[in-house]
Amino acid sequence: DSVTLDHDSLQILQGLTDMPRSPAVDWDSDTSIETTFYPAVEAAIKKAISRSHTVHIFRHGIRHSKNWPVPYNPPAMIAHLDQTGPAAVNRVLRHMGPVDGPRLLQGRYRIVHFWTPLNGPVYTCPVAIASSATVKDEDIRIFISHLGGVGGLGMPLGRPVAKPDPAEQYREDFGAPRYAEGQRWFYLSGISQDEAMLI
C-alpha cells in the first residue's frame, strides 16, 4: 500500500541520487551540514510537497551508536511524537519570528522530519512509524514536558552542552502513543542513501 504525508504522516522518497554525502559533507561540522546538506533537503521537500511556499530547517540531529564521527547519540528505542500540537505552534512562533510566525499559523503549516541514512543501508534499529490515520488522540499521552535548549533536552543539534543558555530555553511537550488494535505500523527495510522518509 502507498502511504502519504496527508493521510499517514509518512511519505517515502526514492531516487535521491543528487543528495550530497561524505566526503562532500562533514557530518561532524554543523557549518558543513548547514551549507552543503540543508539546500538539498529543502529542494527535496519542496519537490515532494509541491504547494510548499516556505521551508525552514530549524535543526538537525545525527543518530548512531558509536562515538565516531559525532558524540554518542543512539536511535530512540520508544515510539514517540517529537511535537504535540501546542509544541508545534510554539516551534513555528519561535523559529519564524513575531511577524512571519503568526502569519504562517493562519494557514497550513507542517513540521516535517527528513530522515535518511548517512552511510549506506540501515539494517539495524530501523525507524518504525504508525500511520497517523490509525492512531486516535486518546491513545497519545504526554510523557515529557521540560525546558529544552536549542535542540531540546539542553542539547543543541544533538550535542551535549555544559550549560544551556537560559535565553534559548523553552517548553517542549512530547507524546507517546499506546498500541491499540487497528493501528498500522511501517518500517522501511534496508533504507538506502538514495531514499528518505518524510515524517
Show the residue positions of the predicted features:
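Active-site environment of non-heme Fe oxygenases that use a 2-His-1-carboxylate facial triad
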Residues: I78, Q83-S192
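N-terminal auxiliary "cap/dimerization" subdomain that precedes the catalytic jelly-roll/cupin core
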Residues: D1-S65
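Hydrophobic alpha-helical segments and helix pairs
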Residues: A43-V99
